[in-house]
Amino acid sequence: MKHFTIKELCRSDTARRLGIDNTPPASAVKALHELVDHVLDPLREAWGGPIHVNSGYRCHELNRLVGGTPYSQHQRGEAADITVGSPTRNRRLLALIKRLDLPVDQCIDEKGCRWIHVSHRAGHNRRLYMKF
């Protein structure tokens, strides 16, 4: 983990405001390391500048409160929602993810590219690209 920290990947203003303990279990910490090592750090190196994590790991309670799906990969430490500041720049980042052919399970252009959801899991990554 060169450019990201576990603390950064678990930070949540919502959890802090509501007093929710968003501490990940060991299995989620391991998955976060995999996500960073295989996707986020290589992407940051290629991008050449900071990438902000809006949301990484979410405990079940936090995931429910923010409207996450019941089977969200965020709950396992396999996903992060990222941005580089604007939809225009995020579209460039999305194009870079595709060009690098990073081992993503899902890469989702969220809400007009306001942020990008990226996930990685141990084993087979489906390389699914979607828009929501």
Task: Show which residues each predicted segment covers.
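Extracytoplasmic cell-surface/polysaccharide-interacting catalytic and binding patches
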Residues: 1-44, 131-132
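Surface-exposed loop/turn and secondary-structure junction residues enriched for glycine/proline
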Residues: 12, 21-23, 60, 65, ...
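Generic detector of short, locally flexible boundary/turn motifs and exposed helical patches
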Residues: 16-21, 46-50, 81-85
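N-terminal start-of-chain detector that recognizes signal peptides
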Residues: 24-26, 52-57, 88-92
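Amphipathic alpha-helical interface surfaces
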Residues: 32-39, 49, 62, 78, ...
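Extended, low-complexity, intrinsically disordered C-terminal regulatory tails
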Residues: 37-67
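Catalytic cores and adjacent binding grooves of peptidoglycan-active enzymes
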Residues: 71, 75-76, 80, 84-132
